[in-house]
Amino acid sequence: MNVFQMRDKLKARLKHLDVEFKFDREEETLRIVRIDNHKGVTIKLNAIVAKYEEQKEKIIDEICYYVEEAIAQMGDEVINNVEDIQIMPVIRATSFDKETKEGHAFVLTEHTAETNIYYALDLGKSYRLIDENMLQTLNLTAQQVKEMSLFNVRKLECRYSTDEVKGNIFYFINTNDGYDASRILNTSFLNHIQHQCEGEMLVGVPHQDVLILADIRNKTGYDVMAHLTMEFFTKGLVPITSLSFGYDNGHLEPIFILGKNNKQKRDPNVIQRLEANRKKFKKD
């Protein structure tokens, strides 16, 4: 599968939409825009091709679902009742776009050296990032949006699965509600986990649909955490960062873990077992 074949495959799957496809050969991207208002999304084809080698049709299904929902929500809808809206925070990499294609700046807050907090209008099956222009429609200030989002993220259930590797404990939150990584902002929950830790607590948000917490009790744990975050980072539809964060009473500090030349620590079976555990938890 190459980028041209992927382009054609996506166009065939999405031909029922009232959209226009724009292929950029140099950037290897496919932009899909609504015909009525020219709003749309851009897909990086080379990244999807890489994921296709392992995930096959699953990644195609996910991309098509994402595009269909995004295009549907980009209609010029009118928000009539602010009491009915749900605003949530979402975590993005610092390299993520700072403004819309129309030039409207997104409402955002600096979070760490690796991450920023954006704010989203929850639309049920998807959400729309809030920009400064939308604030007028919502009749809200940026500060009100931030306060509402933090209040709402604290109400989310923080159900997790656990696994132990060489004496180190790993916690996984993977509800696929779009806000798994956002739970990193629930300081009360993170402090609760820290009180259970016997070693150093690390936190990972490799992509938007997973939050990894770790109780690192020996050197092997650092290497496993580094592998985990990189593994999830490469598989996520919305990757954030492959780095981990040290956590202590509300403070997050990005750390870079140097892998050791130790086959036992780098055993791929460990990563596969943790991934299988996560998938089992998802089904439950």
From Swiss-Prot:
Pfam families: DUF1444 (PF07285). This is UPF0354 protein SERP1303. Disulfide bonds: none annotated. It comes from Staphylococcus epidermidis (strain ATCC 35984 / DSM 28319 / BCRC 17069 / CCUG 31568 / BM 3577 / RP62A). The lineage of its organism: Bacteria, Bacillati, Bacillota, Bacilli, Bacillales. Signal peptide: none annotated. NCBIfam families: PRK13668.1 (NF010189). Belongs to the UPF0354 family.
